[in-house]
């Protein structure tokens, strides 16, 4: 991968993840207790041998920038020409903010050119999966492709969420349609499925640059790889598909777009099963992150009716389950669940404090929230809608606004990420 430059797109507003993205960029949202969403893609880069990466940021990037600086910039060898660097919009070639995925790469065309890569690997910072990009690169080189895009098989009913790829049994891409309502296309590898783009592309640099320059001059373009770049390249360039190979090495392929609150909730709760498909404990494919120093988690009190327990849960360092019960949950660092409280099927971000005699289920609790004694969340949807954000499937999201108004003295709302 020494000839390859990674460009990781992390500038999306994450509107479908609101209110979790009200104060942070989507790739900076917590995942799996101790991680940020962007850690998954960055770990794939490092594990694949890709050690030159630009991260393109834009919206509410303070906590994301800090996380990258503190946790990732130091693990590559600068003296070897390796780097993981953040590139905010610099308006060097345009007066606009990033207007689309292709425009984001175009606006950093000078930074890309300065590294003189032979190949550019374009990635998204908000998906959950394990993938060895080097395998994709080998196919790209062996096939003599100008562009290779990673694909995964999906049900035809899901096409409105994906770029649909017309691919033959030799992996040639003969068509690309972004998020069609329906399609008659079927994958040659499984006639009941459709080949869909994963938003992962390898371009020869000498192909990418002129294509971006041409797109930038088109006033009718959305400046997006899926909507504009790839459909226009079909038939003119050699485009191949790479079938996703999951480094989890389980029977089912695991790739999740956590772009909605329900999808985000489900992906986190996947982790608490006995043998989750997405394996955080694989030493051969470690998931890295930046961790602050906390004491070990502990579970205290063993009295009748007051026993500190956590069952089928991910519990991070610094957590104290003090006479409460936690079931089927993901707890980020420094969470406290106090006596006689029950927390079920929920995600609690860092520094959440659950008071006594609380009952919480199917909820996402943002960081620094203090839940007052006796509070009930997740049991009455209509009541919850009056105070919190509730998804169509009934997941309740409690943000820091709740603590700001309910308990302004005990919570520092302005604590940094």
Swiss-Prot record:
> What are the recorded Gene Ontology BP terms?
glycogen biosynthetic process
Note the InterPro entries from the entry: ADP-Glc_PPase, ADP_Glu_pyroP_CS, GlgC_bac, GlmU/GlgC-like_hexapep, NTP_transferase_dom, Nucleotide-diphossugar_trans, Trimer_LpxA-like_sf
Read off the SUPFAM superfamilies from this record: Nucleotide-diphospho-sugar transferases (SSF53448), Trimeric LpxA-like enzymes (SSF51161)
Per its record, what are the GO molecular function terms?
Answer: ATP binding; glucose-1-phosphate adenylyltransferase activity
Under Enzyme Commission nomenclature, its number is 2.7.7.27
Give the matching Pfam families.
Hexapep_GlmU (PF24894), NTP_transferase (PF00483)
Gene3D superfamilies in alphabetical order? Hexapeptide repeat proteins, Spore Coat Polysaccharide Biosynthesis Protein SpsA, Chain A
- Nucleotidyltransferase: present as a keyword of the record? yes
Origin superkingdom: Bacteria
Enzyme class (EC, first level): transferase
UniProt pathway? Glycan biosynthesis; glycogen biosynthesis
Keywords from the named record = ATP-binding, Carbohydrate metabolism, Glycogen biosynthesis, Glycogen metabolism, Nucleotide-binding, Nucleotidyltransferase, Transferase
Residues annotated to bind alpha-D-glucose 1-phosphate: 98, 163, 178-179, 197
Is Nucleotide-binding set as a keyword in this record?
A: yes
Q: What reactions does this protein catalyze?
A: alpha-D-glucose 1-phosphate + ATP + H(+) = ADP-alpha-D-glucose + diphosphate
What CDD domains does its record include? Answer: ADP_Glucose_PP, LbH_G1P_AT_C
Please give the subunit comment from the record. Answer: Homotetramer.
So what does this one do? Involved in the biosynthesis of ADP-glucose, a building block required for the elongation reactions to produce glycogen. Catalyzes the reaction between ATP and alpha-D-glucose 1-phosphate (G1P) to produce pyrophosphate and ADP-Glc.
Q: Which family does it belong to?
A: Belongs to the bacterial/plant glucose-1-phosphate adenylyltransferase family.
What this protein is called in its record is: Glucose-1-phosphate adenylyltransferase
Q: Which organism is it from?
A: Koribacter versatilis (strain Ellin345)
Which gene is this protein's source? glgC
